[in-house]
């Protein structure tokens, strides 16, 4: 199906300048999306979107445009973005029987190679098949089985931070240490072996490779709208960037191969895949691709939200005091903190939800393509072939969805009665893990980790934000955030320590 609407004039019959003028006129006044509001330049050219993406400001630009143009804006000649709760359901939700799904936009999500797709870029049929297997690995039952393993890494994390304090470190880069922790956890869950980041107090080469390639990957993805230019630029990319991408998948392949050759009763992801695999299961290349995906999706994003929690708590002293009091009142000893008990603290949950709202791990868009025949989105018909999306940052920080949208107010998630200041909040607008059948499969794991890690940090340490990180949240985004160091002063509490 063509992604571009036909212009009923043959380009070869018109001089280039006239053709360009005709295309501009068509896109402004004759195109099926000509009735949608947005910047005129974005209606006739992809260049504004490309510039917003490459400068890391797409999330901010969408927020500004929604303030000017309303709930739906035309951000490219053939693309719309929304900020309403209804748009989540209409674009990303489960489809009614007999209706076609909104497929992932191939100009944003790199199409899968034959036989080697993963959960994000797989087509609908392959995604359903892969999800059937991975659901077992992320079920509540498997989470309970994995808890002991995960808690071991969290305890090591706390020990290492206490060790930093004993050695006289005035501040620690918590953004880095949280990444050490979450990468070690996901490495063990995905492959049955950690990366050793916590033990060595440094990134494993594979982890370092992932971080170095994120920004480049985002820019190359934006270039998909200019295929000829993309092909030209690829020829001049430094070989090191190409080699890093190859190395990422080769490391995943090597670890998967090693794990498949190892018999173990430990409850890692591959053990569940192997247990339930059959003729309709995953091929080895698909296991390798999904393992590589899980390493990034299951680590960096969780660390980002935890860093945001600590940052916003430090910027809002009353919120920090309340959560610390809740945690230290609820748990008289460290061993009381576990997945179940940490989930019972309402204010803790509010802090996490509010951090997800203000600093979503993926602040931009995840576009879909309207199926052939078109569909109704927010009560209005949209033709087939149009790219549509909901912007995370722009939706979560919109005054049409949330009272005092740019303030850190965890109580908004607790005070839900009719008399509350937040009674009119559109809580369904907050979908940081996306929505519908292709929402993030690791949501339960992420929440369990975030609650427990945050509780352990604030139970063990008095925390203070270093002035070097006063503007930490003012970051650029390239699919995920390009974060700077989060420097915190940690003062260990005098509490009994468990012995190994």
UniProtKB/Swiss-Prot annotation:
Cytochrome P450 monooxygenase; part of the gene cluster that mediates the biosynthesis of astellolides, drimane-type sesquiterpene esters that show antimicrobial, anti-inflammatory, and anti-tumor activities. The first step in astellolide biosynthesis is performed by the sesquiterpene cyclase astC that catalyzes the formation of drimanyl pyrophosphate from farnesyl pyrophosphate. Drimanyl pyrophosphate is then dephosphorylated by the sesquiterpene phosphatase astI to produce drimanyl monophosphate which is further dephosphorylated to drim-8-ene-11-ol by atsK. The keyword RNA-binding does not apply. SUPFAM superfamilies: Cytochrome P450 (SSF48264). One of its GO terms (biological process) is terpenoid biosynthetic process. It comes from the Eukaryota. InterPro entries: Cyt_P450, Cyt_P450_CS, Cyt_P450_E_grp-I, Cyt_P450_sf, Cytochrome_P450_monoxygenase. Disruption phenotype: Impairs the production of trihydroxy confertifolin and deacetyl astellolides A and B. GO terms for molecular function: heme binding; iron ion binding; monooxygenase activity; oxidoreductase activity, acting on paired donors, with incorporation or reduction of molecular oxygen. This is Cytochrome P450 monooxygenase astJ. Its cofactor is heme. Belongs to the cytochrome P450 family. Pathway: Secondary metabolite biosynthesis; terpenoid biosynthesis. Keywords: Heme, Iron, Metal-binding, Monooxygenase, Oxidoreductase. Induction: Expression is regulated by the secondary metabolite regulator cclA. Pfam families: p450. Heme binds at residue 440.
């Amino acid at each position: 199906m063509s992604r571009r609407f036909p212009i009923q004039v043959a380009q070869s019959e018109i001089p280039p300048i006239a053709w360009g003028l005709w295309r501009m006129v068509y896109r402004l006044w004759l195109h099926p999306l000509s009735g949608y509001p947005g910047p005129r330049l974005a209606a006739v050219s992809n260049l504004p979107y490309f510039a917003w993406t490459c400068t890391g400001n797409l999330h901010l630009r969408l927020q500004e445009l929604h303030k000017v143009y309303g709930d739906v804006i035309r951000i490219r000649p053939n693309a719309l973005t929304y900020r309403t709760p209804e748009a989540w359901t209409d674009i990303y939700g489960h489809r009614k029987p007999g209706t076609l799904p909104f497929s992932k936009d191939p100009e944003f999500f790199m199409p899968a190679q034959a036989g080697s797709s993963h959960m994000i870029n797989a087509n609908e049929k392959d995604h359903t098949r892969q999800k059937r297997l991975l659901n077992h690995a992320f079920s509540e039952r498997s989470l309970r089985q994995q808890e002991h393993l995960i808690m071991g890494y969290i305890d090591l994390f706390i020990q290492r931070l206490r060790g930093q304090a004993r050695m006289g470190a005035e501040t620690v880069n918590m953004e880095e240490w949280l990444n050490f922790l979450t990468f070690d956890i996901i490495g063990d869950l995905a492959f049955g072996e950690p990366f050793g980041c916590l033990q060595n107090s440094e990134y494993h080469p594979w982890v370092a490779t992932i971080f170095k390639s994120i920004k480049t990957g985002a820019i190359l993805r934006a270039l998909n709208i200019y295929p000829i230019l993309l092909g030209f630029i690829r020829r001049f990319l430094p070989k090191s960037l190409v080699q890093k991408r190859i190395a990422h998948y080769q490391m995943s392949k090597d670890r998967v191969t090693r794990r498949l050759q190892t018999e173990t009763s430990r409850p890692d992801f591959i053990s569940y895949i192997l247990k339930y695999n059959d003729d309709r299961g995953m091929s080895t290349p698909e296991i390798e691709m999904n393992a590589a995906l899980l390493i990034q999706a299951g680590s960096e994003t969780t660390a980002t939200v935890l860093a945001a929690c600590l940052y916003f708590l430090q910027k809002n002293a009353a919120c920090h005091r309340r959560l610390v009091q809740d945690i230290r009142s609820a748990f008289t000893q460290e061993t009381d903190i576990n997945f179940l008990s940490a989930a019972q603290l309402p204010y803790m949950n509010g802090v996490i939800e509010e951090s997800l709202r203000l600093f979503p791990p993926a602040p931009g868009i995840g576009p879909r393509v309207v199926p052939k025949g078109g569909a109704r989105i927010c009560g209005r018909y949209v033709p087939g072939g149009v790219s549509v999306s909901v912007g995370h940052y722009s939706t979560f920080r919109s005054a049409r969805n949330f009272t005092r949208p740019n303030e850190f107010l965890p109580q908004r998630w607790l005070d839900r009665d009719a008399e509350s200041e937040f009674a009119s909040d559109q809580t369904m607008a907050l979908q940081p893990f996306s929505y519908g059948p292709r929402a993030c499969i690791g949501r339960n794991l992420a929440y369990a980790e975030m609650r427990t890690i945050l509780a352990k940090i604030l139970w063990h340490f008095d925390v203070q934000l270093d002035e070097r990180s006063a503007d930490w949240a003012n970051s650029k985004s390239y699919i995920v955030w390009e974060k700077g160091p989060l420097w915190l002063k940690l003062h260990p509490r005098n509490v009994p320590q468990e012995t190994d």
